Amino acid sequence: MVPVIALVGRPNVGKSTMFNRLTKTRDAIVGDLSGLTRDRQYGDASWQGRSFILIDTGGITGDEVGMDEKMAEQSLMAIEEADYVLFLVDARAGMTAADQMIAEHLRKRNKAAILVANKIDNIDPDVARAEFSPMGMGNAIPVAGSQGRGINALMEAVLGHLPRDAEEEALEQDVAEGEEAVRIPGPSEKDGIKIAIIGRPNVGKSTLVNRMLGEERVVVYDEPGTTRDSIYIPFERDGEKYTFIDTAGVRKRGKIHEEVEKFSVVKTLQAIKDANVVIFVMDAREGVVDHDLNLLGFALEAGRAIVIALNKWDGMEPGERAYVKTELERRLFFVDFADIHFISALHGTGVGNLYKSVQAAFQSAVTRWPTSRLTQILEDAVSEHQPPMVNGRRIKLRYAHLGGANPPLIVIHGNQTDSIPKSYSRYLENTYRRVLKLVGTPIRIEYKGGENPYEGKKNTLTDRQVNKKRRLMSHHKKAEKKRRDKR
């Protein structure tokens, strides 16, 4: 599973700045689910090929009342969710009682944590370490989050304590063996296609899982996938292997009630990252709400293939159904590539059709195409609709190749690629999607400029070549002097 790292500390010690730098965003709110994650922000981050989920929390002072008290509780909950904690302190302000209170809480919870002395601009790092040594958190790692100083050392120390997932280890092995660093994922012998069932509480996720497993379900084992109780359920259907990742847990038949489910953002985000295909469940009677858009946005950021299931469709009036379909077109335009199914998980209506869309989305996400095929599609697209002119010169796109999968990454080489407008990129994306008949998966397009491979390189001359060059230059100067004298 993708590790979870939480940023905790007093107010104004630089947690949000650190969050923005590690997630490489300005607002850094990737999974800000209002009402469910009050004062906790979730970001999808990576460092030197290692992926992780980052949680930004509100400040803790120890004397909160009212709303501040609730926000502090959310920060302490983030500590419980995390695999590792970055405890930030302000090197300029020095150690405070609030810092000591947080350190004591981390010790009581026996939480893996590292002390980070932020804002060391113009401060001796050794002095900063000595200042916070009485807290008993080990040597503080000095950083300047706003400038990026010390971040490399910090992340190396943190990620060295966290386990790698199988895909990262396989990719590292490929690189070590000199293989091309492009891994095309596929279903494993054991797991098959991994499907994450996600959605807001009470939309019928667990009911759908049990319905899809069927009366005579084939379950090899049910075991917790993480300490946060995500359940991995391998099973077979029509000879195909699958694994459900159920964040709410599967309840036995007869015990499923549409009670309020405990909603864990971390479990949902981890399930998305670990899945091949996401089935996104929505409540047809409530329509599209902002929480749905936030969750879909994270699945899209993660590049996962998506199938949308609109549950509780039975019993709705024709006018209500027409309104919901109009809202889907209006608000879910950014995932218009995903199949939408109108189902009743309780009665089983339309549920069987989900498997066909899961298979199609997965195949679209992981299929490999040769460079010749992708280049031919590019040439046809350019012939039909030329790129715009830039400073009187036409943008030239030369060839394309596959750079990765799940989602498909198409790398296009050419000149002036930095000037390609977003509208033309969308045109190319739609062209590839139409010609390759892709469904259910996002496509990413990356451009490479026509760089001169010899730029900045200079041959080292031998002594003999240096002497020859010197003689030629001397001869040239003498000849030039004679021509001037004749004039």
From Swiss-Prot:
Gene Ontology annotations of biological process type: ribosome biogenesis
Basic residues compositional bias, start-end: 467-487
Gene name of this polypeptide: der
Annotated InterPro entries: G_ENGA, GTP-bd, GTPase_Der, KH_dom-like, KH_dom-like_a/b, P-loop_NTPase, Small_GTP-bd
Protein name stated in the entry: GTPase Der
Binding site for GTP 1: 9-16, 56-60, 118-121
Top-rank taxon, per record: Bacteria
Positions bound to GTP 2: 199-206, 246-250, 311-314
Function: GTPase that plays an essential role in the late steps of ribosome biogenesis.
Species this protein is from: Pseudomonas putida (strain ATCC 47054 / DSM 6125 / CFBP 8728 / NCIMB 11950 / KT2440)
